[in-house]
Every structure is written in structure tokens, then in C-alpha cells.
């Protein structure tokens, strides 16, 4: 049983980190993938889903991402599989958009961005995306002593027990697990 007011104040939050990466390939005919800056509207402002991008086509650290936002604006050549390198030099290379967009339903933040080269001399772009999640029904919690449990009920503070000073607990755990598991350290810690 957890106190809803404690959850509102930030109790039990967790950080979920997700790594996304893409490779900017170089093709046999001399073409290569590239990064493009954000497309703009008639007023010169970037389109809404491209607002997190910087001038190099990659979102910087600390940028906020909402579902559908683009964080790497990658473009690939349309004729990458064409083997005639001579015709590529004479004609203009056309590109099609292949952006990486944020797909999670919960907002996130770019935590880190890393640009490096692979062994095969291709550019690798990695983004580490951080989400802050609030506890909900069914989430599992554990103490340092191995006592684990699942949130079965989130109760408003008015319905929680309190002492003479009006102090309410943040969490109520079932005490029937202590005799069989013999985790005395948890009893001392509480």
C-alpha cells in the first residue's frame, strides 16, 4: 500500500535509460548517408516535430522529447544500390528522409550524445534517452534485504493511518513475511 501524496512529492521515482543508435553508411557507388538540419515553415521556424534538433541534425543533451519528435534527422541517398559511380559524379544526388523519431508514450530527455567511427570507417551516432517514471499499480519494489513486493493499492493520504503528531507513512508492507524469511536486518532498519 503506497501513499498517493508521497508519490506526488516524488517518492519512488526511477530513471529508465534507453540507448538508440544509427550508422551513417558509405556505399560502394560513392554516396553516403548524411545528417540534415530541421525543415522550416514559411516563417523560418522549424516544424514542431523537429524542434529538438540542432543545426547539425542531432538533438543535443538536455533536449526534451515528446512522442513523435525527431532526434536524429538522417537522410539516405535514393540510388544507394546503383553501382555506376561515374553517373553519380555527373548527376545530382537525391536523398530521402529516414529520421529517427521518439516512439515512447512518456516524455523523455536526451541524456548523452556520442558520435564515433566504426572499424569499417562508418560514422556511428548514439543517443541515450532518459525517462522519469512514477510508480503505478503492479510495479515491484525491493528493500536492501531482499524483501520484494508489488504495489497493490495507491491510497490518498486522508485514508492512510497516522500517529498522534499526524505523520502518515509513505509505504505499508505486509509484516507476515518476516518470521519465515528471518530478515532481521530489515526489522532493525525500520
Question: What is the meaning of each model-derived region?
Answer:
Residues 1-190:
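Conduit-forming functional cores of very large proteins
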Amino acid at each position: 500500500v503506497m501513499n498517493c501524496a508521497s508519490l506526488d512529492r516524488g517518492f519512488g521515482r526511477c530513471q529508465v535509460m534507453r540507448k538508440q543508435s544509427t550508422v551513417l553508411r558509405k556505399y560502394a557507388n560513392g554516396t553516403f548517408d548524411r545528417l540534415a538540419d530541421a525543415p522550416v515553415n514559411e516563417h523560418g521556424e522549424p516544424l514542431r516535430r523537429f524542434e529538438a534538433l540542432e543545426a547539425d541534425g542531432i538533438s543535443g543533451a538536455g533536449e526534451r522529447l515528446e512522442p513523435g519528435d525527431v532526434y536524429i534527422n538522417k537522410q539516405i541517398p535514393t540510388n544507394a544500390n546503383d553501382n555506376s559511380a561515374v553517373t553519380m559524379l555527373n548527376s545530382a544526388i537525391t536523398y530521402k528522409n529516414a529520421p529517427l523519431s521518439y516512439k515512447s508514450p512518456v516524455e523523455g530527455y536526451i541524456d548523452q550524445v556520442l558520435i564515433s567511427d566504426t572499424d569499417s570507417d562508418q560514422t556511428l551516432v548514439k543517443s541515450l534517452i532518459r525517462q522519469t517514471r512514477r510508480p503505478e499499480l503492479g510495479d515491484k519494489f525491493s528493500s536492501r534485504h531482499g524483501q520484494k513486493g508489488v504495489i497493490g493499492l495507491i491510497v490518498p493520504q486522508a485514508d492512510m493511518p497516522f500517529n498522534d503528531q499526524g505523520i502518515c507513512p509513505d509505504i505499508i508492507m505486509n509484516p507476515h513475511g518476516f518470521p519465515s524469511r528471518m530478515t532481521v536486518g530489515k526489522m532493525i532498519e525500520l
